[in-house]
Curated annotation (Swiss-Prot):
Quaternary structure, from the entry: Interacts (via UBA domain) with monoubiquitin and ENT1 (via asparagine-proline-phenylalanine tripeptide motif called NPF). Interacts with PAL1 and SYP1.
Family: Belongs to the VDP/USO1/EDE1 family.
Organism for this UniProt entry: Saccharomyces cerevisiae (strain ATCC 204508 / S288c) (Baker's yeast)
Keyword presence, rRNA-binding: no
Any further remark recorded for this protein: Present with 1380 molecules/cell in log phase SD medium.
SUPFAM superfamilies, A to Z: EF-hand, UBA-like
Protein name: EH domain-containing and endocytosis protein 1
Disruption phenotype: Random budding pattern and morphological defects. Defects in fluid-phase endocytosis and defective internalization of the pheromone alpha-factor and uracil permease. Deletion has only a small impact on actin cytoskeleton organization. Deletion shows synthetic growth defects with thermosensitive mutants of PAN1, END3 and RSP5.
Coiled coil residues, start to end: 593-882
Role: Functions at the internalization step of the clathrin-mediated endocytosis (CME) as an early-acting scaffold protein. Requires clathrin adapter proteins, ENT1/2 and YAP1801/2, for normal spatiotemporal dynamics and viability. Binds to biological membranes in a ubiquitin-dependent manner.
């Protein structure tokens, strides 16, 4: 897409000026200006419209119809260049260079020079002038022909007429909107006249129409007076308006044809001839009168009159009316009358039958002295010639013949090709402004072949004759195809033909063409006043001898001078009539309507008589002149007569020969007649073409010589200019290059300056930021140094711990050797079981007797199981209420019952277990003191001592552990009491349960909302409702263990017996002691909501201890890393946080009591229950067999202080679903890959024996079911939440875990040392005294939270303060610190 490119960029002054003009025109801020918007500005530049249109076409490259700022600037540059030098060619080079001065615009300046016409024509050109009567008459006639009798003209018809004006559609639309006052879509006569008048003003580039007004003024509408024109009453006059001839010829750059047309088209409806018009007509007459004879013959006048494009009949009528002297020559008077009548006819006014009296009385004609009264008519009457004297005419409206010998070249013309019919011809006939204007200079000089040249100056409207050198006339450009040889029938016509060779030179000098198209004029009747034609005077010339071919304008050869003179006359007339306004009014006092009606006939007769008198007076005055001319004419006529006589004789001689041929050719004459006429026309055309070509050849020869001379001069000038241009171009390029370089350097320097400024600002900002960061980093470095020291100290402590644990590993190796020795002893003790077979047989017999009672008890157990489920739900609700700090209503009763039951249980347990109490206590004390478990226990006791009552992280969390403990104790109590299980006391169970939910101060435990275990439980148990129970369970276990260590130790076996029986018991006691040492603090394994398996296991301690013949590596696995698998945490059905039960303790208690073979129904129930809970790695059938074998050696356990809790509720184990859940739990735990599982020891012979004797045992011989449970606990606590090391020690104490410390989030840099988990055996409080080991690392939830925040870059003080503000909520404290950072 092409674009505007300035070789010389716009200067700052130009940019400011052009931007100002552009924004004034772009009122809507669209970035473009339309042609309609810039038209007033361009018109005010004073340049011609054609130049402005070329400027627009040059800058509007894509023909968009609008200009952007760049194109608008280019247009104003071109206007400035053209204002400085108007003759420059229109091209893109005008806007590429800078003009010497900016374009000047004046809104009151006319785009073209206007002629003043007279001194009184000082009117404001920006106002729309009033309509002249001439314009009203022209446009009224056009309306009548278009409307055809209708009162309005339809929009489509008016559009067709308007479009022929070749104005922009937008301009025509605005004119229509102004004229269609009622928006009806049709125009009445006044609206049509106004529209045509505005179109005429636009075409003439009148300043008032540069910007059409929004509303036409009222006085402009009032200037339209639609009075009918009366043509048969010559005394009725219409006053001249201020603009009698319009403004069509005022502002146009007129050509010869337009000036000539204006001479025939500018006539007012009045019949008075002004002095100015008379002067114009006289000037035309003088230009035609080359010989200065004072008269013009028909040979000159006929071609001139034909150029008016009136038909021949109308011209004959005008000739008849104007020829007041009744001769073949016109004087200035007759010529003025004929021209006046032609103008009237072209204006659409019907010609009268006689010359109006007002025309004859015009002062300009000089026929009458000035007299205001029309009654005083003393001038002699002149006979008015009638139309009867005119010879017969052949009306050829489209063709006019010219003499065949006419070889005079004519002036070239630029005429629009229009047809002779339709509204376009009417429009063009009425107003020559509708033709496209051709650019000419302000002054048009028309030259002819004489020494006179006619010059018309558009500025002052005056026509002058200047003496110039003779020049070759311009060639003909019109077609002469319509010319033919004319043979007149009258003697006068033949004399004219004879004189043609003499008149040819005159005809060549007087021919001209005109462009006006005449409208059709109806024929007129003969004049009512007839006169006798003089036989001695020549008749009216025949206008049919000249033809005008369709589509081409032809005339005789004097058009240059005549056209200029006619145009000057028309322009002068219009200016004179506008300036004189009311100078000439009708002086007839009787011109009013009534008087005119009465005197019309008398006036007509008087006018005729006056014409006759004037004609006779004139004839008398010119008799002498005519006498001399008559003599010459007689001589010429005589010669012509002789010539004709000779021709006549020749014709007579050939007449006889042609008579015979005439009869034969008469039939062909009619057919060939048309062909002859066509051939004659073609001959005339050929002759005309020949003469035109000859004249054109002469002209071209002259032009060629002139062109060659001018070409040589131009070449020389071009050479000089090219050299100058080359030098200037080189200089310009150098300057442009320098300007570009300088601008580039300026741009680069400015960009570098901006960049440097930005860089300096950024560097300063970075320096400030780095200063702040340095201070922060120094603070952080100090904190990190402090933290590094702390980590180093902790690392040293961990190294010490690792060394200590290495020493303990050595001790464990020694312990393993001892255990191997003990295993050997246990194998020896297996022989003792054979001694008990007989005893077991007896027990089986007794069991058969109690079978009936078992069935009854079984039914009761099922019922109690339902009650137990309800109690469990009730207890859960109570526990939730307790966790929320709500005490039940019967809290006091429950506490009292719990205390009584505890005392009773303690007494019974003491009475049963006092046999071996002393020996067991000694063994346990010795063993515990010598083992490495004591150190861990001492540590736990020290940490518990250090804890405060307000520690929300580590204690006083309500748990459900008391429930399980109560169940275990109750189960043992039920086993000891035999038939007492049939009627358990639920009230005692609730009291024991409530007692477990109280702390050592008797206050209900409040659950810690910020505990790391509660808030960060594993994913597998986060949604489990049993989580609060497991949290409560842990603290309850710890508190109960601390309170009851002394009582429990009294039931633990500890040393070897001397007798075989006691040796067997001692072996079992030693084996059980190992279990105690590994898991003394894990009180229970809550595999299900009920305590079925645990109760069953506790009722058969002897059997559970029997298969414990394991190696040291199995019971105490070597130290290894703790691998936590999140996916395994949910492998079991109950992914709860559970503790183990103190089964080994109960087992040892029962081993200490003497063997009493007293089978009970409870033993049978728990035997079946154990079968439902297979140990890990064993099948149910294997467990069943082991249970049966173990039943032969079953003894009653010693009842401790918790034996009465939930007594008799073990019957719930009958439910198959619970057993299945427990079985699934043990299987899942076994499959979880626990590293703490004990190896299954098979004793096939013992199992078979127990099976055969139907021994009711409570524990399978394959493994201890309490061992796999810690693995579940270990997996469920693998959540990455920070849990206190103390909590883990308490939960997993005694399990032999090889990893003591959980991964610390806040201290990732501390190396993880393989430290075994601390074992927490149950020892007396007096044994827990020892040195406190400072771990040196964060182990509590608080310290872990502080350390985690410290690892995020905050100081310990900030972390501690934030945690205190947020109630030790790590997430809230983190957000608080980040927000306040």
């Amino acid at each position: 897409m092409a674009s505007i490119t300035f070789r010389t960029p716009l200067s700052s002054q130009e940019q400011a000026f052009y931007n100002q003009k552009f924004h004034q025109l772009d009122t809507e801020d669209l970035g473009v200006v339309t042609g309609e918007a810039v038209r007033p500005l361009f018109a005010s530049s004073g340049l011609p419209g054609q130049l402005l249109s070329q400027v627009w076409a040059t800058v509007d490259i894509d023909n968009k119809g609008f200009l952007n700022l760049n194109e608008f600037s280019a247009a104003l540059r071109m206007i400035a260049q053209l204002q400085n030098a108007p003759n420059q060619p229109i091209s893109a080079a005008l806007y590429e260079s800078t003009p010497t001065q900016l374009a000047s615009f004046s809104i009151n300046q006319n785009p073209a020079p206007m002629q003043s016409g007279s001194a009184t024509g000082n009117t404001n050109n920006t106002d729309i002038p009033a309509l002249s009567s001439n314009d009203i008459a022209k446009f009224s006639q056009l309306f009548d022909r278009t409307a055809k009798g209708a009162q309005t003209v339809a929009g489509d018809k008016a559009k067709d007429i308007f479009l022929k004006a070749r104005l922009p559609n937008q301009t025509l639309g605005e004119i229509w909107a102004l004229c269609d006052r009622d928006a009806s879509g049709v125009l009445d006569k006044s609206e049509f006249i106004m529209a045509m008048y505005l179109i005429q003003l636009c075409m003439s580039h009148h300043p008032s129409m540069n910007t059409p007004p929004a509303v036409l003024p009222t006085q402009l509408w009032d200037s339209i007076r639609l009075e009918p024109v009366v043509v048969n009453q010559p005394n009725r006059t219409t006053p001249l308006s201020a603009n009698s001839t319009g403004v069509s010829s005022l502002t146009r750059h007129s050509t010869i044809s337009r000036l000539s047309t204006g001479a025939f088209s500018n006539a007012a409806s009045d019949w008075s001839l002004s002095f100015e018009k008379k002067q114009q007509f006289d000037a035309i007459f003088d230009s035609l009168d080359k010989q200065h004879a004072g008269s013009l013959s028909s040979a000159v006048l006929v071609p001139f009159f034909l150029s008016s494009r009136l038909n021949q009949e109308t011209l004959a009528t005008i000739w008849d009316l104007a020829d007041i002297h009744n001769n073949a020559e016109f004087t200035k008077l007759e010529f003025a009358i004929a021209m006046f009548l032609i103008q009237k006819k072209n204006a659409g006014v019907e010609l009268p039958d006689v010359i109006p009296n007002e025309l004859l009385q015009s002062p300009a004609l000089g026929l009458y002295p000035p007299n205001p009264l029309p009654q005083q008519q003393s001038a002699p009457q002149i006979a008015i010639p009638s139309r009867a004297s005119k010879p017969s005419l052949q009306d050829m409206p489209h063709q006019v013949s010219a003499p065949a010998v006419n070889t005079q070249p004519t002036v070239p013309q630029v005429l629009p090709q229009n047809s002779n019919n339709g509204s376009l011809n009417d429009l063009l006939a009425l107003n020559p402004s509708f033709s496209s204007p051709s650019p000419t200079k302000a002054q048009t000089v028309v030259q002819n072949n004489t020494n006179n040249s006619f010059s018309y100056d558009n500025n002052n409207g005056q026509a002058t004759l200047q003496q110039q050198q003779p020049q070759q006339p311009p060639p003909l450009t019109h077609s002469s195809s319509g010319l033919k040889k004319f043979t007149p029938t009258s003697n006068f016509g033949q004399s004219i033909i004879k004189e043609e060779p003499e008149e040819q030179e005159q005809l060549r000098e007087s021919s001209d063409t005109f462009s006006a198209q005449p409208p059709p004029v109806p024929k007129h009747a003969s004049s009512p006043v007839k006169r006798t034609a003089s036989t001695t005077l020549p008749q009216v010339p025949n206008f049919s001898v000249f033809s005008m071919p369709a589509g081409a304008a032809t005339s005789a050869a004097t058009g240059a001078a005549v056209g200029a003179a006619v145009g000057a006359a028309a322009l002068g007339a219009s200016a004179f009539s506008r300036s004189s306004n009311n100078a000439f009014k009708n002086q007839d006092l009787f011109a009013d309507g009534e008087a005119s009606a009465q005197l019309s006939n008398a006036t007509t007769e008087m006018a005729n008589l006056s014409n006759q008198v004037n004609s006779l007076s004139k004839q008398a005055s010119i008799t002498n002149d005519k006498k001399s001319r008559a003599t010459q004419e007689l001589k010429r006529v005589t010669e012509m007569k002789n010539s004709i006589q000779i021709k006549l004789n020749n014709l007579r001689s050939t007449h006889d020969q042609n008579v015979k041929q005439t009869e034969q050719l008469e039939a062909q004459v009619l057919q060939v007649n048309k062909e002859n006429e066509t051939l004659a026309q073609q001959l005339a055309v050929s002759e005309a073409n020949y003469h035109a070509a000859e004249s054109k050849l002469n002209e071209l020869t002259t032009d060629l010589q002139e062109s060659q001379t001018k070409n040589a001069e131009l070449k020389e000038q071009i050479t000089n200019l090219n050299s100058m241009t080359a030098s200037l171009q080189s200089q310009l390029n150098e300057k442009q290059q320098q300007v570009k370089q300088e601008r580039s350097m300026v741009d680069v320097n400015s960009k570098q300056l901006e960049l440097n400024q930005v860089t300096v600002a950024n560097l300063q900002k970075e320096i400030d930021g780095l200063g702040e960061k340095i201070s922060v980093y120094l603070t952080k470095q100090k904190e990190l140094n402090d933290y590094q020291k702390t980590v180093e100290e902790q690392h040293a402590q961990l190294q010490a711990k690792y060394q200590d644990l290495s020493n303990k590993d050595t001790d464990l190796t020694d312990r393993e050797k001892q255990l191997e020795e003990r295993n050997r002893q246990i194998e020896e003790q297996e022989n003792l079981y054979h001694q008990h077979v007989s005893k077991l047989q007896e027990m089986f017999d007794d069991l058969s007797q109690r079978k009936a009672s078992f069935e009854k008890a079984d039914q009761e157990l099922k019922e109690r199981n339902i009650e137990y489920a309800n109690n469990v739900r009730e207890l859960s609700e109570r526990q939730m209420n307790l966790a929320m700090g709500q005490l039940p209503e019967d809290a006091k009763d429950i506490i009292a019952k719990s205390a009584s039951n505890t005392d009773t249980t303690t007494k019974e347990a003491t009475s049963r277990g006092n046999v071996h109490e002393d020996t067991v206590s000694k063994f346990v004390e010795t063993t515990v003191e010598n083992s490495n478990l004591n150190v861990n226990r001492v540590k736990d006791d020290e940490e518990k001592t250090e804890r405060t009552e307000s520690d929300v992280f580590d204690r006083d969390v309500p748990t459900l552990g008391s429930q399980s403990d109560s169940e275990n104790a109750n189960t043992n109590n039920g086993t000891q009491s035999g038939n007492e299980t049939a009627n358990p006391n639920l009230t005692e169970t609730l009291s024991d349960r409530f007692d477990g939910d109280l702390n050592e101060y008797g206050i209900p435990r409040s659950q810690s909302l910020t505990s790391s275990v509660a808030n960060n439980a594993p994913q597998s148990v986060r949604d489990d409702v049993e989580l609060p129970e497991t949290l409560e369970e842990r603290d309850t276990i710890n508190n109960t263990a601390n309170r009851d260590n002394t009582g429990n130790l009294s039931h633990i076996p500890g040393e070897w017996e001397a007798t075989p029986a006691t040796a067997s018991t001692d072996v079992l006691s030693n084996e059980t002691t190992e279990v105690i040492e590994d898991g003394s603090t894990t009180k229970r394994a809550n595999s299900n909501e009920d305590g079925e398996s645990v109760s069953s296991i506790q009722e058969s301690p002897k059997i559970s201890a029997q298969p414990k013949a394991k190696t040291i590596n199995e019971e105490f696995p070597p130290i290894q890393e703790l691998h936590i698998d999140e996916s395994d945490s949910s492998s079991s059905d109950d992914d709860e946080f559970e503790d183990t039960r103190e089964i080994p303790s109960a087992t040892v208690k029962t081993l200490q009591t003497p063997y009493n073979a007293q089978p009970t129904s409870s033993l049978e129930i728990h035997t079946e229950q154990v079968i439902k809970y297979p140990a890990p790695g064993t099948s149910p059938s294997h467990n069943e067999g082991n249970s049966k074998k173990a039943s032969t050696n079953s003894i009653l356990p010693v009842k401790d202080e918790f034996d009465d809790e939930f007594a008799g509720l073990e019957q719930a184990a009958v439910e198959e679903d619970n057993g299945a859940d427990s079985e699934s739990e043990f299987e899942n735990v076994a499959n979880a890959g626990s590293m703490e599982q004990f190896e299954t020891i098979d004793h096939k012979d013992l199992d078979d024996e127990l099976q055969m004797n139907a021994f009711t045992g409570t524990l399978t011989s394959s493994s201890n079911p309490t061992i796999p449970k810690p693995q579940v606990q270990q997996q469920s606590t693998s959540d990455p939440a920070q849990v206190s090391n103390d909590e883990w020690d308490e939960i997993f104490a005694g399990f032999g875990n090889s990893k003591a410390e959980p991964t610390k989030v806040a201290t990732p840099s501390i190396p993880q040392q393989p430290i075994p988990l601390k074992n927490d055996p149950i020892v007396d409080a007096s044994l827990s005294k020892g040195p406190i080991v400072n771990r040196g690392v964060a182990t509590t939830p608080k310290s872990l939270a502080v350390e985690e925040l410290s690892g995020m870059g905050f100081t310990e003080e900030e972390a501690h303060n934030a945690l205190e503000k947020c109630n030790w909520d790590l997430e809230a404290a983190t957000n608080f610190l980040l927000d306040s950072a």
